[in-house]
């Protein structure tokens, strides 16, 4: 079972999903869990199957003291770059919380200060602390739902399966059908970028 970072202060865990995708938003979540929260299944969202992720999504939504989820969409990603967009998404998720935490813990190694609240970046934090793991699950499940929704609009890219990640199938579809409004124009969508007509 994962640990709490500090039970004496209010800590929000933050994480993002979709940073490496060619299409769709980068999505972040921030979660404050009650100190009595326990769940043996809770872990980094990447290690969980769909059934467990969906179960935990509902559990976190029901039992979190407060949580926030935010998307940063393609235009902003292209304008400010994916790292800044990922941090912006986490800031926006924190803004949605019902109150500010005393401390923020973030998965990974890059973050920018949010409202002068102390923070710590923790590499592989989603496999160490419950609030970051909870944030990773909300970020992934909310983003996956969005990608499944836009799949209906552009089924040729099979986003319901690849979720916008750079799979062979996704790149083949880009080569065949071109780019959509959901693609990140600043990303290298194909090995030979010159062949894409924006």
Curated annotation (Swiss-Prot):
Signal peptide: none annotated. Its EC number is 3.1.26.4. It catalyses: Endonucleolytic cleavage to 5'-phosphomonoester. Its main location: cytoplasm. Residues 9-198 form the RNase H type-2 domain. One of its GO terms (molecular function) is manganese ion binding. GO terms for biological process: DNA replication, removal of RNA primer; mismatch repair. Its cofactor is Mn(2+); Mg(2+). It is an enzyme of class 3 (hydrolase). Manganese or magnesium. Binds 1 divalent metal ion per monomer in the absence of substrate. May bind a second metal ion after substrate binding. Keywords: Cytoplasm, Endonuclease, Hydrolase, Manganese, Metal-binding, Nuclease. Coiled coil: none annotated. It is found in: Cytoplasm. A divalent metal cation binds at residues 15-16, 107. The keyword Cytoplasm applies. It holds the Pfam family RNase_HII. GO terms for cellular component: cytoplasm; ribonuclease H2 complex. Endonuclease that specifically degrades the RNA of RNA-DNA hybrids. Belongs to the RNase HII family. HAMAP family: RNase_HII_B (MF_00052_B). NCBIfam families: PRK00015.1-3 (NF000595). This is Ribonuclease HII. The lineage of its organism: Bacteria, Pseudomonadati, Bacteroidota, Flavobacteriia, Flavobacteriales.
């Amino acid at each position: 079972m994962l640990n709490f970072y500090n039970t004496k202060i209010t800590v929000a865990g933050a994480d993002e999903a979709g940073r490496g995708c060619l299409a769709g938003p980068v999505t972040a979540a921030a979660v404050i869990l009650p100190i009595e929260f326990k769940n043996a299944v809770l872990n980094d969202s990447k290690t969980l199957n769909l059934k467990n992720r969906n179960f935990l999504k509902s559990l976190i939504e029901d039992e979190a003291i407060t949580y926030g989820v935010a998307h940063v969409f393609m235009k902003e990603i292209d304008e400010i770059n994916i790292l800044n967009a990922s941090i912006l998404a986490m800031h926006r998720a924190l803004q949605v919380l019902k109150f500010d935490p005393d401390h923020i813990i973030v998965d990974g190694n890059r973050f920018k200060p949010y409202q002068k609240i102390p923070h710590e970046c923790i590499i592989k934090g989603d496999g160490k602390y419950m609030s970051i793991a909870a944030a990773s699950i909300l970020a992934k499940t909310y983003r996956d739902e969005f990608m499944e929704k836009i799949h209906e609009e552009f089924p040729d890219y099979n986003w319901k399966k690849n979720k916008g990640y750079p799979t062979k199938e996704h790149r083949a579809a880009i080569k065949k059908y071109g780019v959509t409004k959901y693609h990140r124009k600043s990303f290298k969508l194909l090995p030979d970028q010159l062949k894409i007509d924006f």
